[in-house]
Amino acid sequence: MTKDVTLGQLLRPRQSRIAWLVLLIALVLTVIAWRFSIILVADRTEAHFKTQSLQLKTAIEERLLNYEQVLAGSAGLFAVADLVGRDDWRLYVNKLDINRYYPGIQGIGYTARVEGDDVVSFVKRIREQGLPDYLVNPAGIRAEYHPIVFLEPSTQRNRRAYGYDAFGDPAHRIAMEAARDTGEATMTGKVVLVQEEVDDEQAGFLMYFPVYEGDSVPQIMAERRSRLRGFVFSAFRVNNLMDGIVGLISPFLDVRIYDSDVAIKDALMYGSNLGSLDDDYTFEMSQKVT
């Protein structure tokens, strides 16, 4: 047996309180469910963000390791050949097909170690090899020089770097000395490549790998220093290197790379979307690339 309840009866104090209580409970449950769904979505979004960030870090490190292995192979060329000529170097780099397989590399080159007293005869010898305008720069008297001798591909941009003595620049010398002393590849910090054009300038860095006399890395640091023959190196334009990696792994993330443990403007090397980058993030994660 049912009993119909009129609106008037519901509005009586007792029934009214029950109705409002039911409505309140329904609203509370709705809010709880809504908040739970927001938290669940946020947690999933944050987890996805962290996964993409870790994948990006791994991809960058793997790419740099591949480039390090390329330099190790390039250094090995000097160990198996008594004399590496300009044509030999060009053929070797052409076979690497860096534009296809190693995006971001501006060029692969070789710097020769030249004692201060030998620089005049060294320049003369290089000019006789087909570079009549070859000069060591910047000018100045130094105990030793490390001018660029080979740099391929032989583009107009790269040819401007012939003769550049990076060892005279502290930013390069720190990395070169570390590579010399350890026998391992070492990267510079943020630099502007000598090949850069004013209207197309971007941040860059170089990776140096030591070349020693003989067919093995000397075991003692003193011998590594005395038997240093030069360096093979790769020059990188950071935007070219990173755009492909970021676009593939995390196209919807704003990514910044700094040459510093502190995020300051002068140390900024790369920003994936500089037009939208600000300091207000939904999620944020900092990682050190090694």
Region annotations inferred by a language model:
Residues L7, L11, A19-W20, R35, ...:
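Intrinsically disordered, low-complexity segments enriched in polar/charged residues with Gly/Pro
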Residues F36-Q69, A75, A79-L83, D87:
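Juxtamembrane membrane-water interface segments immediately C-terminal to a transmembrane helix
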Residues K3-V5, Q9-I39:
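Extreme N-terminal signal-anchor transmembrane helix of membrane signaling/transducer proteins, especially
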Residues E46-L54, A79-T290:
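Intrinsically disordered, low-complexity polar/acidic regions
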Residues T2-K3, K265:
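Intrinsic-disorder/low-complexity regions
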